[in-house]
């Protein structure tokens, strides 16, 4: 938090005194660089790693406590672990596919939009992850607990999380892309009004963006909860809680790609 405060203060002083990004006359440059690194790379990576582990442990614990049938427990646990491994695999495969596509398209191009290959990577990973989720679930749990519909219901819940991982970057891009009207408004406010107007313009854009992100997450979690109402009554306790965990599981399945895109920064 302290480095981010110094980072923001340093950036504002650059605007006020019209000095360059890494000008030694600005004593906040070191804190600025530290804050940028902490905010764009180290922070998201650490948070992602922690959440990645916590979500997996939470789902495993829930299955052991809420599912009464030992056979169903084992099937769900094996399915969860296989899904985790395959999601990492789809991220790696998507990277190489996207790299080949981007190289063929931009290798000899005079100009390049650096956001385009990142966006295509996110969507390619999400589409591949969804396809793999349904196929593998059908092969692994076609009649879980004697119910032949659970494989696609569980896959659909995970897909809600995967879609969140693809839709949220698009919403973020609306408020952070260099081509965004909101970003251009902040730039104009910074140029014409100085630090105070810059802060106000940024707060407005930030609060507006948070509304759409929250609405998206709420909607997808609502869909997951609705699907969970179709679970057999004897399958587990509190199926909606398990559904919310699977949404987070699907969202974090794109963790490697999300962190890579976040590290690029707007």
Please report, for each region that a protein language model flagged, where it lies by residue.
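Hydrophobic packing and interface segments
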Residues: 1-266
């Amino acid at each position: 938090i302290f480095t981010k405060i110094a980072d923001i203060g340093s950036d504002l002083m650059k605007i006020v005194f019209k000095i360059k990004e890494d000008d030694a006359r600005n004593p906040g440059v070191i804190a600025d660089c530290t804050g940028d690194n902490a905010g764009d790379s180290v922070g998201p990576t650490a948070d992602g790693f922690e959440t990645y582990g916590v979500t997996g442990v939470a789902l495993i614990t829930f299955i052991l406590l809420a599912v009464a049938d030992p056979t169903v427990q084992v099937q769900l646990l094996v399915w969860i672990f296989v899904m985790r491994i395959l999601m990492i695999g789809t991220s790696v495969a998507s990277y190489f596919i996207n790299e080949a596509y981007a190289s063929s398209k931009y290798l000899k191009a005079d100009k390049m939009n650096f956001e385009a290959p990142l966006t295509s990577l996110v969507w390619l990973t999400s589409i591949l992850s969804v396809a793999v989720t349904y196929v593998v679930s059908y092969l692994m749990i076609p009649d879980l607990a004697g119910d032949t519909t659970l494989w696609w219901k569980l896959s659909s819940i995970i897909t809600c999380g995967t879609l969140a991982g693809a839709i949220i970057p698009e919403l973020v891009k609306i408020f952070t892309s260099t081509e965004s009207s909101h970003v251009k408004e902040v730039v104009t406010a910074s140029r014409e009004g100085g630090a105070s107007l810059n802060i106000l313009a940024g707060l407005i854009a930030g609060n507006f963006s948070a509304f759409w992100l929250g609405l998206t997450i709420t909607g997808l979690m609502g869909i997951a909860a609705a699907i969970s109402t179709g679970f057999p009554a004897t399958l587990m306790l509190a199926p909606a809680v398990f559904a919310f965990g699977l949404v987070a599981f699907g969202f974090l399945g794109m963790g490697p790609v999300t962190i890579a895109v976040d590290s690029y920064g707007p």
